[in-house]
Structures are given as structure tokens and as C-alpha cells.
């Protein structure tokens, strides 16, 4: 083969080699392009998942806040109802405390020794007794009841002990003497009974 023929064949072989190499290069470029295309797609999918998680967290927080707000409203409503109920139930407390002095005075008047044989004194005595009974019946209708009777067990919630002394016929912590009656308004102490207790 002549040199010229060899030179002509070499470009053909080189061209064949170059063309064989080019598909490899194109393939690598195509793969890189596909990876570049895939990467933004994967990034977008990852971003969507991240945003969905954030949205789910935000929805959960909003749901929690809504439940807390509802609970707070229910608590406020319940407290308001209780306040109104207490206001109705104990609205008479101050008035009742003032009435207790009148009841005490009427009871003292009846406890005072008097000549009941005298008709004028007997009529007055009967009138005071009827007035006291009517007053006690009226206050009882409004939930006011006396507490602290001789013979009851001492209870510090309802009674105030003035003194303790050994007394025959009474067990320890039994009320022996009531110095001033106590009263409850709807089971709430408005005045404790002042008592003497057996030791």
C-alpha cells in the first residue's frame, strides 16, 4: 500500500474511531442531562413532601388551638353559671346575718324569767313566741337553718369552742352548752355556734 492510500485509510479509521467515541460521549451527556432533569424533579417532589408535612403540622396546631379555645369557652361558661348560681344561692347571706341578731334577741326575751300568770305579760310572751316561730319558719324557707345543739358532737366546721371542761353526763367532744346558736345558709356556715365542749 502506498503512503497515500494509508493516509486515506487512516482518516477513515480515525473517523470510525471518533464516531465510535462520540456515541459514548453523547451517552454520558444524555445521562448527565437526564440526571439534571431528574434532580430538579426529585427536588420538587422532596419540596412538595416537605410542604405537605409543614401543612399537616400547621393543621394539627390549628386543630389543637381550636380545641383549647373551645375548652376555654366551655370553662368560662361553666364558671359563669356557677357564679350566677352562687349569687342566687348566697345573695341573702348579708341580710340573713343581720336577721340573726333579731332572732337571738327574741330567743333571749323568751328565756328571761317572767311572771307568766299576769295576763298582760302572758299576752306579750305569747306574741314574742309566735313572732319567733314565724321568723324561724320564714328563714327556713330561704335555706337558713340553725346548727349547734346540746349533745351534738363538736365539729370545728360548724362550732366555735369557747371552752372545754369536764362535765358529767357528756362524752368527750360533746357540746354541753350553747352560748350562741350558729346558722347555715344552704349548707354554708354564716355564723358558727359558740359552744362549751366536754373535755
From Swiss-Prot:
<keyword id="KW-0143">Chaperone</keyword>
<feature type="region of interest" description="Disordered">
    <location>
        <begin position="1"/>
        <end position="43"/>
    </location>
</feature>
<dbReference type="GO" id="GO:0000774">
    <property type="term" value="F:adenyl-nucleotide exchange factor activity"/>
</dbReference>
<dbReference type="GO" id="GO:0051082">
    <property type="term" value="F:unfolded protein binding"/>
</dbReference>
<feature type="compositionally biased region" description="Basic and acidic residues">
    <location>
        <begin position="1"/>
        <end position="10"/>
    </location>
</feature>
<dbReference type="Pfam" id="PF01025">
    <property type="entry name" value="GrpE"/>
</dbReference>
<dbReference type="GO" id="GO:0042803">
    <property type="term" value="F:protein homodimerization activity"/>
</dbReference>
<comment type="subunit">
    <text>Homodimer.</text>
</comment>
<feature type="compositionally biased region" description="Low complexity">
    <location>
        <begin position="29"/>
        <end position="38"/>
    </location>
</feature>
<comment type="similarity">
    <text>Belongs to the GrpE family.</text>
</comment>
<dbReference type="InterPro" id="IPR009012">
    <property type="entry name" value="GrpE_head"/>
</dbReference>
<dbReference type="GO" id="GO:0006457">
    <property type="term" value="P:protein folding"/>
</dbReference>
<dbReference type="InterPro" id="IPR000740">
    <property type="entry name" value="GrpE"/>
</dbReference>
<dbReference type="GO" id="GO:0051087">
    <property type="term" value="F:protein-folding chaperone binding"/>
</dbReference>
<dbReference type="GO" id="GO:0005829">
    <property type="term" value="C:cytosol"/>
</dbReference>
<keyword id="KW-0963">Cytoplasm</keyword>
<protein>
    <recommendedName>
        <fullName>Protein GrpE</fullName>
    </recommendedName>
</protein>
<dbReference type="InterPro" id="IPR013805">
    <property type="entry name" value="GrpE_coiled_coil"/>
</dbReference>
<keyword id="KW-0346">Stress response</keyword>
<comment type="function">
    <text>Participates actively in the response to hyperosmotic and heat shock by preventing the aggregation of stress-denatured proteins, in association with DnaK and GrpE. It is the nucleotide exchange factor for DnaK and may function as a thermosensor. Unfolded proteins bind initially to DnaJ; upon interaction with the DnaJ-bound protein, DnaK hydrolyzes its bound ATP, resulting in the formation of a stable complex. GrpE releases ADP from DnaK; ATP binding to DnaK triggers the release of the substrate protein, thus completing the reaction cycle.</text>
</comment>
